[in-house]
Amino acid sequence: MAKVDVVERVTEIIAEVGAPLGIELVDLEYKREGRDMVVRVFLEKREGGINLDDCAEVSRQLSDILDVEDFMPERYTLEVSSPGICRPLKKVVDYERFMGHLIKVKTFEMLPDEAGNKRKTFTGKLTGIADGVIGIDLTEGQHARVPLDKVAKAHLEFEF
């Protein structure tokens, strides 16, 4: 099974397993580390936050299904955890949910802030999302508008 198919099927299984528990997939990594592949799953709960027991339950059920379906093309290690305090932002609903939070965005290409300075990294308060563009009040006092299709990576930043 191709890598994209593995990711798609694991995503489907997590949705099936997580839904009754109120658990959603935040991010999924499937990549080579050393000689083995790693399936790294990051989960969250909309209500009350995810805990170790939740992660263990999803891990157990996911592992059982992966064993039964036996579609993984090679040996792998399964890791299931919360996304942590620097949670990635992947979907529009993530940006909507974390409005007003400090974020860091890295783009595929250089983009201008409101002063015309070009950069690939934007750090500041998320102020909005509309029409596929996120607004950020930068820590330097400027404002930036970043199209979602230009975002390579985005995540929450820890605020001291």
Curated annotation (Swiss-Prot):
Transmembrane residue ranges: none
NCBIfam families: PRK14647.1
Keyword presence, Magnesium: no
Protein origin, superkingdom: Bacteria
Primary role: Required for maturation of 30S ribosomal subunits.
Organism from which the protein derives: Geobacter sp. (strain M21)
PANTHER family, sorted: RIBOSOME MATURATION FACTOR RIMP
Family per similarity comment: Belongs to the RimP family.
Lineage start: Bacteria, Pseudomonadati, Thermodesulfobacteriota, Desulfuromonadia, Geobacterales
Protein's name according to its UniProt entry: Ribosome maturation factor RimP
Gene: rimP
